[in-house]
Amino acid sequence: MRLPAPIADAYGVAIRCLIVDDNNLFLDAATELLAREGLEVVGTATTSADAIRRAEELRPDVTLVDIDLGYEDGFELAEALSDRVAADSSVILVSTHSEEEFGELIAASPALGFIAKTQISARAIRELLDAG
């Protein structure tokens, strides 16, 4: 079985992704799916503190952040990541909820955009990065 070519930026470098979610089953499934589609998943985190530490350490091109991180707020994490991580890193919010439920909060956040968890793919991420 042939693996897909890595999903790359404009310079041909594979896109590096950090995934933040409090659900380990989702982390495993998303990691496997995105890696199979050619994205380089460089790490995962289950809490805001861990996400900030991992983002500073790993310097991903994009961080997928669950809006509902258990007792934590994904919107606050998106703000913190934007403030603390280099400007060349983007945040994309994800959720099992629809974009319409959080439309105003998503628009007001520093996140590049939103992808429903059921729609996560390397292509959807690439499209948001290209549009951003």
What are these regions (language model features)?
Residues 1-16, 120-132:
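Non-catalytic signal-transmission and effector/linker regions of two-component phosphorelay proteins
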Residues 24-43:
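Two-component/phosphorelay signaling modules centered on CheY-like receiver
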Residues 47-50, 73-76:
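Acidic catalytic/metal-coordinating carboxylates
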Residues 66:
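Active-site residues of response regulator receiver
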Residues 70:
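The feature encodes the CheY-like receiver
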Residues 74, 106-113:
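As written
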Residues 75-87:
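Short amphipathic alpha-helix used as the core "switch/output" element in two-component signaling
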Residues 93-95:
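Hydrophobic/aromatic residues positioned on beta-strands within the core alpha/beta folds
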